[in-house]
């Protein structure tokens, strides 16, 4: 049986299986680190990503039939971006290669494996987009009745991406934070396991990204990892992954973790700048980065604590900077990611300009969390440069356009 811990209160004797929060202080719960045995190793001969790292996950058995082939996403060298910034080792971890085109599949895969092992029949999630599609897909794969709650007014693309998998799809009026809280009580009364953003098993799944980066860099840790930040569960999962590697003696230097928010909704970056231990709820401003616009991040205080303990960094970038970074990643490196993902490159530029990153200091990994194909509507008003030629003038026209003509 798994044991749990709270960063503030310590180990718990028992836990409400329908709540991810500590009953004492209301902060998120984690799988207890002290309960993990030493001598864990990576099984590189295994095909499935979660099987490779099974020693580090709270799963007694992994059913391959529940997997959609998530994980082992490419770590792509960003040579042109690096040269433009005067930085040698820049990589993009392309999470768009996961089954539903985002990093969420890593957490969902582990959470669903656990749910099935416990005999769960009903699962659900509260989401603004990526997690809706992911939970619906894995619920369909496992044959579970799946409930997806989205905030009223969610984009048609978000609704359609989840609806194709056949879940009980519900649009709910009201505040997203209130919906998150309400889902937990409703789930307990109706027997629905809501595997929301800070579900402890979901966060365990996010550790696998850290393990993959370690292998893909030749069994070493990067100097820095830059990751978009919303609820905090993804970032904390990554941090726990590197902590596991450190605990097993597989890495000697813990990477600097940089969390990035949108300036229009940056409660954690603002709290970090002020040196606060707890974030202050804010009224969300306007931003195109809806997937990371969370004014009440449920793991926010845990993120602030871990940033202090691990010398991490939080910052916010503008919509203009993230859109410019999105275009640069696409045109320079062939990687089309969501604007939220491109916050990582925008943050990298900010750190370079401030002298916080210099050439020769080690590798930097940008976590590109999702595909730009999920947010095509944001490009609808972007100008298109299209050249028009008649067939008899095509060759001459192409010659004029060619950089090598």
Residue ranges and their predicted role:
Residues 1-405:
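PLP-dependent amino-acid enzyme catalytic core
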């Amino acid at each position: 049986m798994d044991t749990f811990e709270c960063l503030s209160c310590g180990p718990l004797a028992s836990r409400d299986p329908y709540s991810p929060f500590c009953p004492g202080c209301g902060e998120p719960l984690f799988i207890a680190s002290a309960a993990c045995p030493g001598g864990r190793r990576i099984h590189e001969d295994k095909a499935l990503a979660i099987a490779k790292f099974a020693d580090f996950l709270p799963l007694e058995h992994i059913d391959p039939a529940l997997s959609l082939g998530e994980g082992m996403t490419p770590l792509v060298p960003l040579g042109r971006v690096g040269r433009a910034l005067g930085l040698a080792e820049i990589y993009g971890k392309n999470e768009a290669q996961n089954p539903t085109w985002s990093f969420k599949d890593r957490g969902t895969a582990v959470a669903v494996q656990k749910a099935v092992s416990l005999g769960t029949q009903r699962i659900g999630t509260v989401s603004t987009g990526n997690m809706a599609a992911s939970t619906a897909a894995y619920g369909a794969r496992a044959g579970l009745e799946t409930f997806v709650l989205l905030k009223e007014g969610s984009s048609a693309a978000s609704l359609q991406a989840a609806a194709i998998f056949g879940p009980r799809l519900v649009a709910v009026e009201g505040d997203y934070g209130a919906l998150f809280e309400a889902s937990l009580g409703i789930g307990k009364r109706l027997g629905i396991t809501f595997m929301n953003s800070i579900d402890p098993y979901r966060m365990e799944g996010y550790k696998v990204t850290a393990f993959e980066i370690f292998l893909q860099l030749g069994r070493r840790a990067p100097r820095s990892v830059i990751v978009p930040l919303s609820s905090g569960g993804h970032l904390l999962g990554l941090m726990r992954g590197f902590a596991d590697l450190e605990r097993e003696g597989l890495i000697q230097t813990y990477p600097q973790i940089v969390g990035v928010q949108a300036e229009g909704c940056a409660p954690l970056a603002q709290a970090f700048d002020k040196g606060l231990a707890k974030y202050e709820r804010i009224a969300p401003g306007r931003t195109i980065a809806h997937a990371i616009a969370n004014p009440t991040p449920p793991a926010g205080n845990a993120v602030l604590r871990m940033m202090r303990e691990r010398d991490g960094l939080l910052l916010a970038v503008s919509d203009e900077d993230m859109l410019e970074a999105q275009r640069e990643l696409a045109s320079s490196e062939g990687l089309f990611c969501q604007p939220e993902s491109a916050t990582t490159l925008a943050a990298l530029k900010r750190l370079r300009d401030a002298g916080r990153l210099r050439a020769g200091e080690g590798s930097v990994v940008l976590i590109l969390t999702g595909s730009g194909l999920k947010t095509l509507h944001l490009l609808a008003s972007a100008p298109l440069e299209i050249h028009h030629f008649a067939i008899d003038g095509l060759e001459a026209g192409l010659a004029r356009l060619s950089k090598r003509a």
